[in-house]
């Protein structure tokens, strides 16, 4: 669902010239109307962002930052695609859209792999504790410090 959200934004914005013009207008004209329009768009996504923020917070993944970078990148790719290729990719074409989708899938895999790794490490640490392995050895084996260990054990 995470990756599909960004793919849908890319497709919908690609096909919506009115929204593209609105984004350009918001970037070039700062007034109460453009601010309200941009802020409303941000608020509309608040529930989704909060869901992901809660999901990724234990693994210390700043998903709001990642999402904002991806959204900003999508805006740029769409608004710039008529001007020139970006990194030799022509985002006006089906191949360009496929390249975008592959990139989003790759980044999503990395983000979710980190979350899974965090959960796996937490389980391994708890198992080591129950097996009687000392905290200092756990820190050594896991490559973490005592504060990180305490954080993992407190969650």
State where each predicted segment sits.
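Intrinsically disordered, low-complexity regulatory regions
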Residues: 123, 154-155
């Amino acid at each position: 669902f995470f990756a599909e959200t960004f793919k849908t934004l890319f497709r919908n914005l690609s096909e919506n010239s009115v929204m593209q013009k609105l984004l350009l207008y918001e970037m070039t004209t700062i007034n109460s109307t453009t601010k309200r329009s941009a802020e409303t768009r941000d608020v509309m996504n608040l529930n989704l962002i909060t869901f992901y923020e809660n999901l990724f917070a234990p693994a210390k993944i700043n998903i709001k930052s990642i999402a904002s970078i991806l959204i900003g990148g999508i805006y740029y790719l769409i608004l710039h695609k008529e001007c020139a290729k970006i990194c030799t990719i022509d985002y006006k074409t089906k191949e360009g859209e496929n390249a975008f989708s592959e990139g989003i899938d790759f980044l999503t895999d990395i983000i979710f792999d980190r979350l899974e790794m965090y959960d796996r490490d937490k389980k391994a640490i708890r198992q080591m504790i129950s097996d009687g392995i000392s905290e200092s050895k756990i820190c050594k084996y896991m490559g973490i410090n005592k504060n990180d260990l305490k954080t993992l054990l407190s969650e």
